[in-house]
Amino acid sequence: MRDLLNLFKQPGAQLEDFDAIRIGLASPEMIRSWSYGEVKKPETINYRTFKPERDGLFCAKIFGPVKDYECLCGKYKRLKHRGVVCEKCGVEVTVAKVRRERMGHIDLASPVAHIWFLKSLPSRIGLLLDMTLRDVERVLYFEAYIVIEPGMTPLEQGQLLTDEQYLEAVEEHGDEFDARMGAEAVLEILKGMDLEAEARRLRDDIEATGSESKIKRLSKRLKLLEAFLESGNKPEWLIMTVLPVLPPDLRPLVPLDGGRFATSDLNDLYRRVINRNNRLKRLLELAAPDIIVRNEKRMLQESVDALLDNGRRGRAITGTNKRPLKSLADMIKGKQGRFRQNLLGKRVDYSGRSVIVVGPTLRLHQCGLPKRMALELFKPFIFSKLQRRGLATTIKAAKKMVERETGEVWDILDEVIREHPVLLNRAPTLHRLGIQAFEPVLIEGKAIQLHPLVCTAYNADFDGDQMAVHVPLSLEAQLESRAMMMSTNNILSPASGEPIIVPSQDVVLGIYYMTRERVNARGEGMRLAGVEEVHRAYQTGAAELGARVEVRIRERVFDDSGEMVERVQRRQTTIGRALLFDIVPDGLPFEAVDRELDKKGVSGLVNACYRRVGLKGTVVFADQLMYTGFFYSTKAGVSIGVDDMEVPTDKEEALRSAEEEVREIEDQYASGLVTSGERYNKVVDIWAHTNDQVAGAMMEKMGKETVVDAEGNETEQKSLNSIFIMADSGARGSAAQIRQLAGMRGLMAKPDGSIIETPITANFREGLNVLQYFISTHGARKGLADTALKTANSGYLTRRLVDVSQDLVVTEEDCGTTDGLVQTPIIEGGDVVETLAERVLGRVVAEDVAVPGSTDIAVEAGTLLDEDWVERLERMGVDEIKVRSAVTCETRHGVCAKCYGRDLARGHGVNIGEAVGVIAAQSIGEPGTQLTMRTFHIGGAASRAAAVSQVEVRNTGKARLHNIKTVQHHSGSYVAVSRSGELTVMDEYGRERERYKIPYGAVLSVGDEDPVEAGQVVANWDPHTHPIVTEVDGYVRFHDFVEGVTVQREVDEVTGLSSLVVTDPKSRGTGEHKRQVTNANGKVTEERVAYKDLRPMIKLVDGDGNDLNIAGTQIPAHYYLPAGAIVSLEDNAEVRVGDALARIPQEASKTRDITGGLPRVADLFEARKPKEPAILAEASGTVGFGKETKGKQRLIITKADGETHEELIPKWRNVTVFEGEHVEKGETIADGEPNPHDILRLLGVTKLAEYIVQEIQDVFRLQGVGINDKHIEVIVRQMLRKTIVSDPGDSLHLKGEQVDRAKLLEENEQLQAQDKQPAQWEPSLLGITKASLSTESFISAASFQETTRVLTEAATRGIRDDLRGLKENVIVGRLIPAGTGFAYHAARRQEAPAPAATPEQQAEEVFASLGQGEGEGPSPSDEASGPEVE
């Protein structure tokens, strides 16, 4: 009974169940109500007796006893005196644990501003007072007076006065007015503020003013005032008059041996505050001179600043060893802070770690656990079993037995472990497959055995990797481990839906070796009655694995109706394939293995098995496949010898001809036909091409061998060269690596990524000379340095992604939207990169799909497309489908199952409660790390593709030109003069087969709708320069060409040929150029132009010198030249349509690996504006050009209704539209990388989603990483959570305010229900960091980044956190509202009992201690009526 009573007395026990957490400002009364007494002295403990000093920082009277149930002087000991307060030492007799929760306080002799609300930008105190931070600081740190009450004087409230001004005012007005300095002055002003009147005034001001910047400034202040009004915070609480003292056990003082003490930095900081506070009290009692008191007050302010946030203002206070002391703010922020170190990641009991070794004999669901480790991990289970068996009477006896390791202990360990899964984890855990459950198998030794097939998921290898083992203790945990985390349940990768339990290396090699066919092998032509005979023939040596034989095969497959039927047929196959078919499960046809299986094939086999046979069969099959693969790769006896690296005979020839070509280009350069940049590009191209040629010849030679068949004729077959079969099977190595061994090492990159133009012509077999070796190490070092940096970058990207998407969970079945994204196949050049089937697999159709060419419906809306469906659609020739997407889902919180589609890791529709946000973040983040760790595998060899310079059609069909504008050259061909043009090739059904971008200046040999043949070259261009093409005949006139200033004449020393190169305006120096200007009356005047404002341009004039216009328009034919353009024409030269006036050299391409890729992905997700963004048309209409300003041209778009839209574009931007051309809203006007914010504004959400998905997929595709589009869409959805209010209507928002989408929609529904005007809004795109920081949950945001800023803002606004996301729930120590926790939270919400009826006085105590005022009672929360925690 006593225990029961005691529960009420313990302050931490009342609140287990709460629904929300609110953060706010603490009033002085509230701080006093938390406190158990005032700390008056800076002493800590007595150094002789080790007892805490009375009234000191560790005082037992205030904070509670040091030992359980024992007062300090020792008068009361034992449990029976519980609750007694000792009259001698004043200590309450209770548990010592209260020293972790009892707080004290310090009464400050002078008020002090809280540094967070002063210095955390924007300064809240400054904003409330409408003063600049600098001014507020001058008042607080006693450099200026502030007028509090002007009285009848001409001074204004809030005016600052220096010492001199103050003395003058006192002389003039006496004590008519009140002006003071320091925090008390600010406190007085804040106390006297009438927030409501101020807010009304601001609203009127906002309506009255028209200036954008003023509105922005006023609404910032208005928002803060309203936050104060709503939250019940009072402005004067920003200034502290009482300082709370942290419980002593949270800032411990630990005696070290040798009589010294280790202490928390906080004690030093508190001591400082107390010392200064006491000194100030004394000075005030003594009525010391003003200047001394002022100085002391300032020092008090500084010491409190240091305690709260050391180093935020001025120099940080340092301890003895020159290291800044850790203040309260440092305790919670950063990687080592409370949030990330202790709340989000904890150390786990019942765990161990050890090195891993390979366990090739294990089954897929097993792992080998060392006996000693298991004994230690399962101790409590063993103890209880020993006791239950009566083998040990007490726990102590059981412990002894276990330590002696008697025989019974091992038997019991076997029992305990049976069917008790353990979790294995390998750091870094980049995705959810980094922790999986296995059944332990006890083994001797000290290393953990791991099944080879799960290595891919863990990214583990056996070169010394370590793994951790964890034991799930509770029944629920064991159940979850078995049902969801077992390795056998994780066969498919959540990122792409492909199998991840896929054989690699030896296994692939063995299976490839089995399924290879050999000409004239022993036993060729045998006829065998069944697989048993095949076994016999192979084992007796009558036949070899690759021999072609005829076998009677008995297969069991599913027929069309889905029934299992048996078929027996005679098949021509090889011994190896028949043997392999023996382990294939029922339901897979013999065709599945009747081919040469490389890594892709084996992966496809596992996938097909999963789809046809299901999970269980696949698991068994995967194991069998592994055992078989290991067996036959051992049998194959593959080994590498130096002779296997066959250097092709025609390598010498290829090198010689390449050197010839290079010499020729050097000659051209010498004769001035090409520039230095072009020469470099061409040389690099030649070598890249040669390298491919040599590699091709080498693979040709290695991959074929000549053999004699049974008839005695010579035939060629695939070779059995060891290196070749390793690469060909996909077991290890790649063509690129073999090329370096036996071909030529090729071009290498410098550390800055540029390619060294002299390649390494030797290979590793021939060996490198010193120079070649140096060049090769040069690039390789960069690879290693990159790896270290990229790993960190990638980890940070993953962290940001998880943070932005962590609260996205599937919360309902169907949101009922018909919106979605239109999917089409992705075609790059002549290749279909991703078919429509691959893109829509596992998605839900948004609108009925019609059969092409008819009105019949092929698929109804709402169908989840599985493999069978997409195959059917492929056969029908459907080329676009609108599917549901997370981006367009209308669920308020979370996303619905229909919009998400298939759960990729399970292969069926997604379950409610699945944490799709985190899965998406992991799927995108994990390959980032993988790829970055993989940059150096090719050893810095520059993998640069030879530049494309022509379009060669692959399929016969019809050419179609899309937005290409051409002019006819006098030679008869067409020249493209538009930029975003594309040429597509259609097959006879009108389906698009190929798509090519046609650059400006390309020469086309076909027109629109012309027939083309496969292999025909339809367009070609110079890849290294960008021409400026004339569209009229005429004569060239140079304008603003000033040699030595705007253009440099470059004369080639060898040839004497000269060309003009336009200089960069930034590097022109200062000076002025005089130029003649003819005005309208024909009068010639002279004007002076600064060098940097000169704009070199080529005008075209007719024979009489009049300006020519571009055909069919009123635009003069003026061509501005950008910096770097090369002009080879002379003034007054004659040009014809389609001629090039100038060439702009293109940059040499740097090697693109994901290093270019990772920052690119980060830029896209952060929604950063590109350096030179493309300029998009703001409206649809006809283009015109208006009056130009000095550096800009004015582009005018006239809409169909006659409205015009103007835009100023810098003249140096290459405008791609011409006068009179029609543009659509959102079309590109000036080249560049599109700005995602523009795409969203002009083209809408779906186009934005398509753009981001496309760009990110391009980066990953380049690296051969498959990620499903839906993961990227999920992140995009999270980036679009916020909206900008464009018209507030009758809502309380301000124009331009950023509001959460779900919140705004809910408010609008309420407004419409009351027949009021809802707020109008536009979607807003936030980068992932910004989006994470602006989430509804302050706990989640604070634990992510910028903790101080987030908490400061949350506290002033008095925000409640409804604990919706996963992160908040982990931090407060609950199950997450996803997965199995989803049901728990739903049940909690329904039960939510009314607060227990305790006697009135106790309830009051509870709420008083919570600081909600006397018995206000709980404020009702959204979903339930549990009290809030403050």
Curated annotation (Swiss-Prot):
Gene3D superfamilies: 1.10.132.30, 1.10.150.390, 1.10.1790.20, 1.10.40.90, 2.40.40.20, 2.40.50.100, RNA polymerase II, clamp domain, RNA polymerase Rpb1, domain 3. Its EC number is 2.7.7.6. SUPFAM superfamilies: beta and beta-prime subunits of DNA dependent RNA-polymerase. One of its GO terms (cellular component) is DNA-directed RNA polymerase complex. Disulfide bonds: none annotated. DNA-dependent RNA polymerase catalyzes the transcription of DNA into RNA using the four ribonucleoside triphosphates as substrates. This is DNA-directed RNA polymerase subunit beta'. The lineage of its organism: Bacteria, Pseudomonadati, Pseudomonadota, Gammaproteobacteria, Chromatiales.
